[in-house]
Design a protein with these regions (language model features):
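A short acidic, Gly/Pro-enriched loop at the edge of an enzyme's catalytic core
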Residues: 161-171
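S-adenosyl-L-methionine
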Residues: 126-160
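Class I SAM-dependent methyltransferase Rossmann-like catalytic core
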Residues: 49-78, 82
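A short, conserved alpha-helix within the catalytic core of class I
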Residues: 158, 179-192
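Core SAM-dependent methyltransferase catalytic element
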Residues: 255-293
């Protein structure tokens, strides 16, 4: 394994808990090219201070306990998420990243929650409406997290792309790809996201990683884990090319073979296994894709 440590410039290096660590992981067949490494270093010189301020905002006091395992500064730097960008967060869920992104983008950028196409996700009208209601309430929810006006934030469902196509700089899919894989809607959801991206837009994926030799029955999303090469191939089939891969969210201590799936690992600890409590969170791939031409 080769590793490159990019020290944050100036005050950012003091404010963040750890330097940006980017690694190529030959065992998974993908790494960072030198151009992306240089670009990431330049990105941190330009935006590191603003990113640091968002990560260390007092409203994230409770969230920071997960920072050593989720590496938000390193992850957003690797994805080159700038504070001026229009960024879509797919399946925002509990708001851990929304709180950070709200502060980081709320001044000059745009944070848009991206919610599943309700018509594809379920045939139950009540559940469809619930998805639409979640999207409608996203702006107020992030405003509550950040103290910023709700008008600075918005959300859409992926059956409502008109007026939004080709306008997003970045889309983030954080620990969510397995859910749409097992629901059978991954292809249509990813293709909708592709329509939202600008020609030079990028999509960043963080996903629980199965072992390369894991059986399909374990690595099909039902246990929360996916194989890295399967994700790369899936994205290629849906019109994307891999830009770079990072090991910043890797955890070799995770055996990724838990009978009840990734939820046995912290922070969920669904089976309360004592031997898993000290292992950190799951082993994760961190992948960056561009639109294929």
């Amino acid at each position: 394994m080769t590793k490159l440590i990019l020290a944050l410039a100036g005050a950012s290096a003091l404010a963040l808990a750890a330097p940006v660590v980017v690694a190529a992981h030959e065992a998974h067949g993908a790494g960072m090219d030198e151009a992306h490494i240089r670009d990431t270093a330049a990105f941190m010189k330009m935006h590191g201070e603003q990113l640091s301020a968002a990560i260390n905002h007092p409203s994230r006091a409770a969230d920071k306990a997960r920072d050593p395992f989720r590496h938000p500064a390193e992850t957003l730097a690797f994805f080159h998420v700038g504070p001026h960008m229009k960024v879509g967060e797919y399946a925002p869920g509990g708001g851990w990243y929304s709180r950070l992104l709200g502060h980081y983008l709320g001044g000059e950028g745009q944070l848009v929650g991206l919610f599943a196409n309700p018509l594809a996700a379920t045939t139950d009208p009540a559940r469809q409406q619930r998805i639409r209601d979640q999207a409608a309430g996203f702006g107020a929810e992030v405003a509550g997290f950040t103290g910023l006006p709700a008008a600075r934030f918005s959300a859409i469902t992926l059956d409502n792309l008109e007026g939004h196509k080709g306008t997003f700089d970045r889309i983030l899919v954080i620990r969510a790809l397995h859910n749409i894989m097992r629901a059978g809607i991954a292809d249509t959801e990813i293709r909708a996201m592709r329509e939202l991206l600008k020609d030079d837009g990028l999509i960043g994926i963080v996903q629980h990683r199965a072992k390369a030799d894991a059986p399909w029955s374990y690595a099909n999303g039902s246990k929360g884990y996916l194989k890295q090469q399967d994700v790369i191939d899936f994205m290629r089939l849906n019109g994307f090319e891999l830009v770079a891969a990072s090991e910043v969210n890797a955890n070799p201590r995770d055996s990724a073979d838990h009978p009840e799936g990734v939820w046995e690992m912290p922070p969920v600890l669904s089976t309360k296994r004592e031997d898993l409590k000290a292992l950190g969170e799951s082993d994760r791939m961190t992948l960056l894709f561009k639109k294929a031409k």
